[in-house]
Amino acid sequence: MLECLSALLVLFAGGGGSVLAAVQSKTVADPNLCPGYNSQLISPFLSSCKRNLSECVSRYFDEQYAFCRSCVTVNNETMEDLDNCKCLQCALSSLNNSCFHDYCTSKDEYDKLQIVVEQFQLTNGVLDDGEILKPRGNKFSSRKLSYFVGQNNTLFRNPLQFEKNQLISALLTSLTNNQKTISSVDMFEVVDANNEVQYLRERTISGKTLSPATGYEEENDGDCSVKDKKWEGKIEYHENKKVSSENCSKDTDDKSGSKKERNTKAPLFHTATEIHMTRWSSWRPKKIFTRYLVNEYQSPKIITTVNRFYRTKTDTETGTTLITSTKAKRRWFPRTKIVTSTATSTFLSITTTTTTNAIATKSLVAVLNPDGLNKKAGINFGLFSANGELASPDEGGTPTVVRRDKISDPGAANEQATLFSTTFSQVPHLPELDSGEFISAASQLDERIFIFTAITVSITTLMMLGFSYRSRVSFRDHSIDDSDDDNDWSDDEVEFDEEYFYSLPVSIPEKGISLDKMAQQLGVE
C-alpha cells in the first residue's frame, strides 16, 4: 500500500512543484474528545436494550438539532478537530428522545439516562440550537466533507458517516454493562509507523470476511478497481498487494509463511481539483490547476497539493504626457463699500382760502407843528387819494386770496410750506376829480410802507408815555396830601408846553406802483 501511495504522489507531483502537507486530526469517534465528558466516570447501566439500538440512534441523529449535520468544531488555522461536544449532544438526545422507549424496557435505566443527560448539560452548557451556520468552501471540502462558519468565525464541519457510527457505538459501549447486547462495528487501527495510511481491520468469522464499514458503498468482488457509485468515479480504491486475474486480494505472508487468504480493503482516497484563472494578463489568461489527494479516514489525513504556476511575458507601452501648470498668487485687499438708498416722496398740497374783511378806517390826530393847535392834518391808514384827502367811508373792503404750497418729505421728516398771498384792492370812482390817478393804498404796502408804519406806531407810543409822565417833577415836591390830585387824569387839567412837542419825519409817498407791476412782483397771473 505504501508503494502504491508513493507512486500516486509522484504521479501528481510530476507536472510541477508540489507541496505535501500532512494534517494530524484528532479522533472524532472518541466521546472523550469532548472536554466535559469522561466515560470512565460513568458506571454502565444499560442492559435491556436491543442489539440494533445503534442503528436507531444513527437514524435520528441529524433530526435532533439544526447543528447535528455540522457538529465537529475545527481549528481555523490547522484544520484539526477540536471537540465533538455537539455531536455527543445529538447522540444522547437521539437515544433519550427517539430510541429508548422503542428499544429499551427498564424504567430505572431511563431514570439513570436522564441523570447522565442533565450532568452533560450542566458541564458543557445548553447548546444553542438557533445558531446560523454559513457554508464555507476551501481546499479541504469535498462532496462528503463540508465546512461551515458560525458565530465569532468558529469553523465547523460535518461528521462523516463512519465517524458518526463509531461515536454512537463508543457512547453506547460506555453506557452498557454487557457489551454483547450492543452490535459490534468495524474498528480502525494504525498499521504503519508513520501514521500516514490507516487500514481497515479485517476479521474472519467462520471463513467469511466482514462487510465493509458503514458509510461506504458496496464493492464489486470481481473487479479490483471498484468505484463508488455515489462519487461518480471520483473515489478510487487502491490495492497494496499483487493483483491476479482470479483473486485480487490474495497474498502470501513471506515472514510467517502462512498461506491464509486475506481480503484487504484499501483506504479510501479521492482527488479534488480546483481551477483558477489568472489575472496577470487580460488578453492571455492562464489556468492554474490545484489538485488535492484526500484520505477520508479519520486519522491521519494526507493531503497532497499540486500547484502549477505559469510565467507570462507582458509588454507594456507607456506614453508620457507633460502637463505644466502655473499657479499665481495674488494678494487681494478687502474693500468695504456702504451703499445707502434714500427714497424721497413729494406731496403737493394746494389750499385756497378766500377771506373778505371790512377795513375800518380811523384817523389818528397828531400835531405836526409845535406853534399852534389849530392846524391839524389827518393821516389815514386806509384807502386815500393822491391829494391827501381822506377816503370816503363808503369805499368797499379788500378781497384777499392766499395760496399755500406744502411739500412733505417722509424720508427726511421735513415739511416746507410756501405761502403766496395776493391782495386785490378796489379804489372807488371819484367823480368830483377831473384829473389825477387813483392809487390804492395796498400798492404802498412795500418795504418802505412797513418801516414807516412801524416807526409811526413806535413814536406814537412814546408820545403817549411822555404825556403821562412829568420829568421835572420829583417825588419830593409832592406830599401825602397831593397824592389824590395826582390820580386825576382828566383832559381839562392837562396843559402842554412847547417842550412836549417834537417834529416827526413823516413822509407820505406821492405816487404808488401800478396793479400790473404789483401782480408781477407777487407772482400772480
From Swiss-Prot:
Record's subcellular location: Membrane
UniProt signal peptide: 1-21
Residue ranges annotated as Cytoplasmic topological domain: 470-525
Membrane topology: Single-pass type I membrane protein
Extracellular face residues: 22-448
Ranges where the record places region Disordered: 242-264
Keywords carried by this UniProt record: Membrane, Signal, Transmembrane, Transmembrane helix
Protein name in UniProt: Uncharacterized protein SCRG_04024
Taxonomic source organism: Saccharomyces cerevisiae (strain RM11-1a) (Baker's yeast)
